[in-house]
Swiss-Prot record:
Disulfide-bond pairs as recorded: C4-C54, C13-C37, C29-C50
Domain of life of the source: Eukaryota
UniProt protein name: PI-stichotoxin-Hcr2h
KW Lipid metabolism (keyword) present: no
Main function: This protease inhibitor shows two different activities. Almost completely (95%) inhibits TRPV1 (IC(50)=6.9 uM), the capsaicin receptor, a non-selective cation channel expressed by sensory neurons of the pain pathway. The toxin also shows a weak inhibition of trypsin and chymotrypsin activity (Ki=0.2 uM and Ki=0.7 uM, respectively). Shows analgesic effect on mammals. In vitro, it shows cytoprotective activity in the oxidative stress agent 6-hydroxydopamine (6-OHDA)-induced neurotoxicity model.
Compartments reported by the entry: Secreted; Nematocyst
Swiss-Prot/TrEMBL site (Reactive bond for trypsin) positions: T14, A15
Swiss-Prot/TrEMBL keywords: Disulfide bond, Ion channel impairing toxin, Nematocyst, Protease inhibitor, Secreted, Serine protease inhibitor, Toxin
Family: Belongs to the venom Kunitz-type family. Sea anemone type 2 potassium channel toxin subfamily.
Domain BPTI/Kunitz inhibitor: 4-54
GO MF terms, alphabetically ordered: ion channel regulator activity; serine-type endopeptidase inhibitor activity; toxin activity
Length: 56
């Protein structure tokens, strides 16, 4: 569950992927745009995956 407390990382690349991260302040999985590189573990392809891992 450590990845769920990691910050959202958009990354320096310029791709446009809609992903989800767990926002530890709100306790919810939230969409964001991921650039495609240099992210972290708090980066999920689907809302369902985010909720399953982080129990949101």
């Amino acid at each position: 569950r450590g990845i769920c407390s990691e910050p959202k990382v958009v990354g320096p690349c310029t791709a446009y992927f809609r992903r989800f991260y767990f926002d530890s302040e709100t306790g919810k999985c939230t969409p964001f745009i991921y650039g495609g590189c240099e992210g972290n573990g708090n980066n999920f392809e689907t809302l369902r995956a985010c909720r399953a891992i982080c129990r949101a």
